[in-house]
Amino acid sequence: MSNYIVTFKDGVSKDEIQKFKDEVTSEGGEIGHTYDGLISGFSAKIQPQTLQAFQQQASISDSVIETIEPDSTVTIQ
């Protein structure tokens, strides 16, 4: 399992986001942090098959998913 940040387009309901979080956990993944400020989304350890399903969903033009990015540490020098 790898860590990813999944963000959603403006106007996506908390219930819709929860469906994606539930899918992560039902497939054995773990939710890390939930973002509900300037961006809506969550970080999670996601199983490969769940990641693939999310990526397919994100490729659809009317998808609610904005981005799926590998989670990483950002430093400022």
Outline where the language-model segments fall.
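Short amphipathic alpha-helices in soluble, non-transmembrane regions
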Residues: 17-27, 53-62
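Short, surface-exposed ligand-recognition loops at beta-strand->loop->(often short) alpha-helix junctions
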Residues: 7-15, 46
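Short structural boundary motif marking the start of a folded domain
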Residues: 1-4
